[in-house]
Amino acid sequence: MKIGIYGGSFNPIHFGHIGLAKWVIAHTDLDEVWLMVSPNNPLKDSSILEDEQVRLQKAKEAIAQLPSSTPYTLHPTPTCAERIIVSDFEFHLPRPSYTANTLRELHNHYPQHEFTLMIGEDNIAIFTQWREYQYILDNYRIFIYPRRGCAPYQLPMGKDLQVLTNAPY
């Protein structure tokens, strides 16, 4: 199964997050998008974050409100609500949360899946500050989605980078 890892604080989750996840499901080859609620981001001030369990619960509630039924067909397909999964996977990893570590552990726990990292284009400017960024570039496909107000950027060299130019932002 092809799974998009959409990490973030989700402080709070909002229509933009959900809209992007739905768009990626509809317009790429991903089977699922996992909203990876991060307990803390080493590049952000964690003192302004709502409690991690509260953020996780709000994300679950937001996804649960998506339509969960599809019209009857001979070959039913999963709905968006069934293909967007809210995950607390990072809650069970050493802190702070580093994306490379999360991806490595996901691969160890779910070797049958192919993971794609989803990041906003605002992260490209600071990507080389990420711990083990080269490991991520060398081993994972990366979807880069647009962010309002971002300055032009140069893409890092990596295994498989795809800019989602038509994705909502």
What is the role of each PLM region?
Residues 1-169:
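Nucleotidyltransferase catalytic core that binds NTPs
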